[in-house]
A protein has these predicted regions:
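ATP-dependent small-molecule kinase phosphotransfer cores
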Residues: 1-14, 72-81
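Structural recognition of the conserved hydrophobic beta-strand(s) that form the central parallel beta-sheet
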Residues: 13-18, 37
Length: 165
């Protein structure tokens, strides 16, 4: 959007959240700004020894969020992956070096939470590009979603959050 809005912080703090928040066109060029990149960084290694790339965990998150929040079929989200990846390379990654620090947003139990929500459908789709995701999920126990706090980041993907999105 071309809309801009000036905010007078009066000495306070403003937190801008989102995938485009590192872009200086969004947050400005002010040298006083502290920028933090938040994304999955963890690589899960199944028994086969082939690590699951963080981009696959981000895809799983997108599939769940699109399904629960947007009513989109998993196959639709998977079909959009190439376009989403191109956008990430063009609009997000160039600004990643502007971050003063980074936070790994991976939760150790998250794939176990996603497993009962996704595994059967992923098995049915049998897509070669997701075979590594299935391999990891097959090795994990189910983690009931009701164990995830309602204000957890994971709720953005599985639904049931008390926070507005």
């Amino acid at each position: 959007s071309d809309e801009t809005e000036a905010v007078d912080l009066q000495g306070g703090v403003c937190i801008v959240e989102g995938i485009h928040a590192l872009n200086p066109e969004v947050t400005g060029y002010d040298g006083r700004t502290t920028r933090i990149y938040v994304s999955v960084r963890t690589r899960i290694t199944p028994r086969s020894g082939h690590p699951l790339h963080p981009s696959k965990i981000r895809l799983v998150r997108r599939m769940l969020r699109d399904s629960t929040g947007r009513g989109r079929a998993l196959s639709e989200t998977i079909a959009m992956r190439e376009r989403v990846d191109r956008g990430e390379q063009r609009y997000i990654m160039p600004f990643k070096p502007r971050a003063h620090g980074s936070i790994d947003s991976f939760y150790s139990a998250e794939l176990g939470v996603y497993r009962p929500l996704l595994r059967d459908e992923l098995e049915r789709l049998a897509l070669p590009e997701l075979s590594d995701v299935l391999e990891v999920m097959r090795e994990l126990p189910d983690v009931p979603a009701d164990l995830v706090p309602q204000d957890s980041l994971l709720r953005e993907f599985i639904g049931g959050s008390t926070l507005p999105y």
